[in-house]
Amino acid sequence: PSMLFSTVPSTLFSTVPSTLFSTVPSTLFSTVSSVIQYSIHVIQYSTLHVIQYSTLHVIQYSTLHVIQYSTLNVIQYSTLHVIQYSTLHVIQYSILHVIQYSIHVIQYSIHVTQYSILHVIQYSIHVIQYSIHVIQYSTHVIQYSIHVIQYSIHVIQYSILHVIQYSIHVIQYSIHVIQYSTHVIQYSIHVIQYSILHVIQYSILHVIQYSILHVIQYSIHVIQYSIHVIQYSIHVIQYSIHVIQYSILHVIQYSIHVIQYSIHVIQYSIHVIQYSILHVIQYSILHVIQYSIHVIQYSIHVIQYSIHVIQYSILHVIQYSIHVIQYSIHVIQYSIHVIQYSIHVIQYSIHVIQYSILHVIQYSIHVIQYSIHVIQYSIHVIQYSIHVIQYSILHVIQYSILHVIQYSIHVIQYSILHVIQYSIHVIQYSIHVIQYSILHVIQYSIHVIQYSILHVIQYSIHVIQYSIHVIQYSILHVIQYSIHVIQYSILHVIQYSIHVIQYSILHVMILACSM
């Protein structure tokens, strides 16, 4: 600084004692030797006084001034600059970058979750539409089978009517038997139609609708709960980020105090205060680190609990789906039993018809031979119709109902399994994304902390080196200035001594002349 050596006191060479020449004895200038002795005395006194004053006073003043100015100003400037640069810029940059990265990670997780939920819903809708299409196709098959049965009944009715028209005056009893058998067949067909329609409506439509609706509702609840767990994990991450920021701030404050302590080692008088501050910071940082570890452990426990809840919910969905499938299988088995019972009724009706026709033929064989031929022909028609009915019913039952039920069960199992597997993959991927984001944020925070601490340490080392350079330069300048002052003082003393000697000689000569 330009003002360092401009404050030399103006009284440095004006403090020569006023009694220096007032205490000269009257007999001092009686001889030349006394004048020389007095001059030597003046030179010794002035030289000693100037050297002591200039050397000690100037060195003490300049050294103290340089140390105070360089130490205080450099420490204040370097500390303030380090605090402003490292604390504000590093913290602003690290917090801004971490917040931006966390926002991007959270937005990506939300996008993945929305896409997975939308994909599951679309796939479930496609499965439901395909199941409805299969059910509609099965309904068309059953309707076609009903039309075949109605046509067979129409053929039977027409053949029976034709036989009755040709043998109406011969066998009235057979007409009653055939009418009764026709009513039995119609009732059996009605039972079959009712049982088939009821089984299809109840077992396929209601069970599939109930199971799919319940699975979708439960999957939506599981997904909502997973979203709630993800939101809670995000809150835990935000709280961890807050704790990390708080710990970073305390680490930076601790680094600043360590730098102040390393700089203020020169001043021994405040060593105790720095040691107490260091002890308090170490104690607070230890507790902050322990608290951060506790928060991280708690967040890990929360994530483990979320995984446990997701596993339990998935297991509950699988168990409930298995229960629904078992109940559907029981309903299908009951429907098969009803169909088998209807088949037995039809077979019994056919047996009654055959027995009644045979009995009528035996009672009327010697009365109407032509009627026998007609009846035989009608019997063949009826047998053929019965065979067609049996074949159509068995074929419809075996092909349409059984295959449709098996295919529907297969589609339901495949859709439920695919939805569960896809949900598990989505949940695993979400957990992986969350774990990766947490790990990446922690690693990036550690990297930012390490980089900021390293930058602060490097900057502090540069400040200390600059302070040492300033102190060395100040001491060198003080030494040069002291040498210059000493040289100037010696020159001034010599000039002043010569002036005193000249004045003394002149005074002696004047005294000698007057004597």
UniProtKB/Swiss-Prot annotation:
Keyword Cytoplasm: yes
Chief location category: cytoplasm
Incomplete repeats: 28-32
Sequence repeat ranges, renumbered to this chain: 4-11, 12-19, 20-27
Gene Ontology cellular-component terms listed: cytoplasm; dynein complex; microtubule; motile cilium
Region (68 X 7 AA tandem repeats of [IL]-H-V-I-Q-Y-S): 35-508
Keywords: Cell projection, Cilium, Cytoplasm, Cytoskeleton, Dynein, Flagellum, Microtubule, Motor protein, Repeat
Compartment list: Cytoplasm, Cytoskeleton, Cilium axoneme; Cytoplasm, Cytoskeleton, Flagellum axoneme
Function description: Force generating protein of eukaryotic cilia and flagella. Produces force towards the minus ends of microtubules. Dynein has ATPase activity.
Complex and partners: Consists of at least two heavy chains and a number of intermediate and low mass polypeptides.
Annotated family: Belongs to the dynein heavy chain family.
Protein name stated in the entry: Dynein heavy chain
